[in-house]
Amino acid sequence: MTNLQESLPKELLRTNRSGAYSCSTIVDCNTRKYHGLLVVPVPELDDENHVLLSSLDVTVIQHGAEFNLGLHKYQGNNYSPMGHKYIREFDCDKVPTTLYRVGGVILKKEVVFQHYENRILIRYTLVDGHSATTLRFRPFLAFRSVRQFTHENATASRDYSEVDHGIKTCMYAGYPDLYMQFSKKNEFKFCPDWYRGVEYPKEQERGYASNEDLYVPGYFEMDIKKGETIVFAASTSEIKAVSLKKLFDKEVDERSPRDNFFHCLVNAAHQFHRREKNDDRYILAGYPWFKCRARDTFIALPGLTLSIEEDDYFELVMKTAMKGYYEFMEGKPVSVHIAEIEQPDVPLWAIWALQQYAKETSKEECFKKYGQFIKDVISFIQDNKHPNLKLEENGLLYTDGKDKAGTWMNSTANGRPVVPRTGYIVEFNALWYNALCFCASLAATVGEEDSQQKLLAQAELTKQAFLDTFLNEYGYLYDYVDGNMMDWSVRPNMIFAVAFDYSPLSQDQKKQVLDICTRELLTPKGLRSLSPKSGGYNPVYVGPQTQRDYAYHQGTAWPWLGGFYMEASLKLYKRTRLSFIERQMVGYEDEMSSHCLGTISELFDGNPPFAGRGAISFAMNVAEILRALELLEKYQY
């Protein structure tokens, strides 16, 4: 913990399942503009999260000597006040717990984010102390969007009001009040000041501005005795101070352990939940900067819910998403907060997600709850009502992606797609064939024979065109085909044609595709987005925005693709691939103690040492590894 080169890259995330979060490094030194102790949505201002309370510095005072446990990075590679040197232990199996030792003083800090409330709770316990001890708490306030910085200014309000064992304050109009309260009566000393030149090195690495000033209104001070606990709460609403200790205990009791790989992933899955005031339910695409996105929602939903026996949340999210997609199909303004719902593969992934639901419950149950929606989506596609998904006479779907990316490989540079996938997209048409066959099986289950035969006829047409269009002489699949232009790049999108329950490929063709994915794309962190043997391979995701955009889908490795790869392997080779897949899991399990603890980063460099990059926690990655673990267990028994 005292070695900053080792501790600063490790981050910690906790959420309230309603969009708010708390995030920093394990030594509480903020290294991103997205870091903060209390980061909450402020819908009255915009659709971004906002950092209200950046950090809380604690100072231990004995015999007039002060020992500040805080840590900030300032310009010029200066770290102050170096409180990390007092850390003796850190653990986050259930709740993040830090043990500080200052001379004869041992102070324990535990942190929990109250579910469904914008309230962070921190419990301090004086485990040992042989002299009179005082704690001083100095809050660092930001009151700004996660995408901006704050600087010293004359506009910020210095006003505050006393509340139960604390104060409330608000720096700018439009923001909610920030309540800072303690379980114990204390003295607040008003001495406003700006701490200037706080620096965030992760933003420097990403080519962005990286400096800001933070406002400190003063400090709280109180005595603490050996064995005593004090609970601090920061929130957008007031709470009775006398209830804080019981509330902390209650929240801890509700937490499940993070004592193994599976439990870490389950906890990570819950962090993507978002419940809004109208009871709409969502899946966030990732932390700390992603919002809810349609494609991510449908890909991640089965793994984040069905694979951990949480069918109820699947149904709640699907209810919200269906409402939004019906609005889109009907040409109405979309009322739900799901971005990119117009993307052409979204309806295809929605049907795939419902296919997983049918396998978890039954086809009868799936048809009863979602049959009409599935029919409506199929008709929407067949009637060519989607603005960028055209069903052609050969049975394949055509998408225009020349000027605006329409697939998950959506990075742009200078206003143009970096990977201009256009025409017949391989995974779109694998999804379409799978959807047609699945819908035909649903129709058969409920006795709709005419519908079944029509769907099967459409599927047969699509199958033949798929083979004629995508299968090349080397045994793998073109990534996309547009007229006479065939993209020969070896990319992972062909893995879906092997992994899906219904595939136009024969067993031998599947094996050929899987083999080339294994040889050229497989890494310990998922499948590369491009083979090293293909032109334009760029496996390291670092540098300014444009540099990263060019690398985003040109060789970086993605764990969620690894999930589909493992599914394809198990379906083709059954139990003979169990030990191989178990070894693959080691690469993901290692991530539980790297980068953001207990979860999986967005993407990884395509070359050793396969460093984690991008968002610190990514829903599709967590979901697909959970789904692969479930599949692994099924094939073991």
Q: Whereabouts are the PLM-identified features?
A:
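The feature captures the catalytic groove of carbohydrate-active enzymes
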Residues: 119, 191-223, 228, 328-349, ...
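Internal amphipathic alpha-helical repeat/solenoid segments
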Residues: 279-297, 335-336
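Conserved oxyanion/phosphate-binding beta-strand-loop segments in alpha/beta enzyme cores
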Residues: 250-287, 316, 530-537
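Transmembrane beta-barrel strand/turn architecture of Gram-negative outer membrane proteins
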Residues: 137-140, 354-356, 373
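Terminal accessory carbohydrate-recognition/targeting modules of carbohydrate-active enzymes
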Residues: 1-257, 261, 288, 310, ...
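Alpha-helical support elements that line or immediately flank enzyme active sites
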Residues: 290-321, 493-505, 514, 566-575, ...
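Long, well-ordered core segments of solenoidal/helical folds
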Residues: 265-278, 308-330, 372-391, 404-406, ...
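Non-catalytic C-terminal accessory modules of carbohydrate-active enzymes
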Residues: 68-95, 102-106, 383, 515-525, ...
